[in-house]
Amino acid sequence: RAIPRAISRAIPRGIPQRATRTVHLALVLLTSLMLGLVLPASASAVTKNGFDLSNSTLDSKDIKRGGPDKDGIFALTYPKVIPAQESPLAGSERVLGVAINNTYRAYTIRYLHIHEVVNDRIEDQHFTVSFCPLCGSGVLFATNINLVDGKTANLNFGVSGLLYNSDLLMYDRNTQSLWSQISAEAISGPMVGTKLPTLPVWHTT
């Protein structure tokens, strides 16, 4: 096989043909290694904690890793509920209060500091209680929502380990989309641009 002209010019005269083939092969391998080093770097520029940020509505440089990996902070799903009169908590305990269909629940800030996200339901209303310890913000979302394929689903949320302006970015396990707690909107993934309905929540004791 003929050696490309650009490469043959770079090879001094008098070198045996076998040696020139070795040089040619070495140049090809070097080029492949260089491409292998470049491609992962460009891909990692739009991926953080395993989330694809290529269609993010936010600048990916402003999305920061909070420390834990994806699901490094364990979100709760359908936690056990106990009556208020059986609760060992003091009356001064800070909680997020939820009222749906004349049913009342209190989610303690103490435990929300640990878990940040609680997926729960009252009758047919599925919802997610979210709390960002850095901002002190508690937001309640209705999670019965239409997906991009037109189907209806109950989104189940987890903690991404990512922050935007020091605020919690959740993700839904249904589509792996990232959601901003403050804007109640998907900022990347298949659900990008979709808004989550919010429900009243009370910061109280």
Regions found by a protein language model. Give the residues of each.
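Intrinsically disordered, flexible peripheral segments
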Residues: 41-205
